[in-house]
Structure formats: structure tokens, C-alpha cells
């Protein structure tokens, strides 16, 4: 992958090749959070079911980042997850689910279904929406992000009785030291990453450089 930095001598932006993890923590750098192993714990709202993810506790409005690059497949209200985002990886084998986002302003500005996002991009903000058939309701007691990961080896597995959701607790532990640094532009109000990122396997550098 490559990271865009500003040359201190010329002041011009340049793309610098880099090596390492192509995945980021779902929590932006500098924001406190905590979690515990809760995969498989029982949930009772609506119907009895196991918890198919990991709850990450933090402060209201904490920026949420895309763990892996991919395409936004789901965006909007779900009575269980509240305001949520579903992102499919570029190879279409992983589906990332981010739920219980902030009331009123759950998403990063301009986020839309069909949009491609890079790993580490701000996609939304932590909240406590959900557990309501009515939209935009805070019915979750504790502010947190529900983060889930579904493995999809065949499209028939996307929505069925044999979906494969995995325990992401160890993944979040691994990514805790690899967080995306972000900041809010005081003029536009948009949240941007401090070091723009380009996955060279998914997007040609010359295309990214044109942005």
C-alpha cells in the first residue's frame, strides 16, 4: 500500500510505498475504549439468539473506521443494530458489520451504498441506537460499537440459517496497536484521516494520486 505525505521541502503531496497490515482498528487513534469476550452470549430482544460479534465500549461520537477496504453494501436502520453499516471486502469473502451508531448523525458525511472505502477511513460514529422498530431511537443502555465479521464463501451464505460469523475479539486485540489517525476539518466539518492511504492491490496509485 502507499501513504500520502507532504514533502517538507517542496510542500507537495507525494505517495510513499509502505508495508505492513492492511487493516486498522475499528476505533480511531487517540480515543479510549474497552471490550471483553462476549461472542456467543445470549441476547433476548425480539427473540433468543447468540451474540454474533464483539461490543466495544467508548464515548459517544467516537470516530469509527473501516477495518478493511471494501464496498458499502448496507446502510440505514435495523431494529436490532440501530443505525448500522455493512461493508464487503474487495474479494467479497468478508462482510464487516458496524452497529448501534450515533443518533441523528450516525455516518461520515457522504457515505452511501455502493461507495468504496479504504481501510482506516472514518465511516461513522459510536452511539447507542437500536432495539426499536422506530428509527433513530436510543434504546441501548450503554454507548458502544457492535463489530461483527461474517465469512462468505458462496453468495448463498450471505443471508441464510447457516451464516458464518466469527469471534472478532482476538482480531480487535491484534489491531489495537494499528489505529487510523483522524481529525475533523474545522472548515468543512468532515472527518479525514491524517495520512491518506491507498491499497495498491485494489486501486492503482495513479488513480489515487488524481484525488
Regions found by a protein language model. Give the residues of each.
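Surface-exposed, glycine-biased beta-strand/turn segments
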Residues: 1-83, 119, 172-211
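Structural recognition of the beta-strand scaffold that forms the well-ordered cores
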Residues: 55-57, 64-66, 86-88, 95-99, ...
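Short, flexible loop/turn elements at secondary-structure junctions
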Residues: 58-60, 76, 89-91, 102, ...
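Residue-level signal for secondary-structure boundary sites
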Residues: 64, 106, 155-157
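Zn2+-dependent peptidoglycan hydrolase active-site motif and core
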Residues: 66-110, 134-143
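Conserved, short, structured surface segments that act as functional micro-motifs
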Residues: 115-186
Amino acid at each position: 500500500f502507499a501513504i500520502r505525505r507532504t514533502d517538507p521541502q517542496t510542500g507537495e503531496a507525494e505517495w510513499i510505498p509502505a508495508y505492513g497490515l492492511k487493516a486498522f482498528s475499528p476505533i480511531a487513534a487517540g480515543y479510549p475504549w474497552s471490550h471483553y469476550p462476549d461472542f456467543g452470549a445470549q441476547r433476548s430482544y425480539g427473540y433468543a439468539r447468540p451474540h454474533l460479534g464483539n461490543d466495544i465500549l467508548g464515548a459517544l461520537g467516537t470516530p469509527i473506521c473501516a477495518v478493511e477496504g471494501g464496498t458499502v453494501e448496507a446502510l440505514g436502520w435495523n431494529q436490532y443494530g440501530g443505525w448500522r453499516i455493512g461493508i464487503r471486502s474487495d474479494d467479497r469473502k468478508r462482510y464487516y458489520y458496524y452497529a448501534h451508531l450515533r443518533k441523528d448523525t450516525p455516518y461520515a458525511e457522504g457515505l452511501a451504498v455502493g461507495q468504496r472505502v479504504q481501510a482506516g477511513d472514518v465511516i461513522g460514529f459510536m452511539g447507542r441506537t437500536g432495539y426499536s422498530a422506530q428509527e433513530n431511537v436510543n434504546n441501548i443502555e450503554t454507548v458502544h460499537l457492535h463489530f461483527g465479521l461474517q465469512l462468505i464463501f458462496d453468495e448463498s451464505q450471505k443471508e441464510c440459517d447457516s451464516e458464518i460469523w466469527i469471534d472478532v475479539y482476538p482480531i480487535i486485540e491484534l489491531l489495537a496497536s494499528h489505529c487510523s489517525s483522524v481529525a475533523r476539518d474545522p472548515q468543512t466539518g468532515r472527518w479525514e484521516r491524517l495520512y491518506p492511504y491507498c491499497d495498491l492491490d485494489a486501486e492503482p496509485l495513479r488513480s489515487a494520486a488524481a484525488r
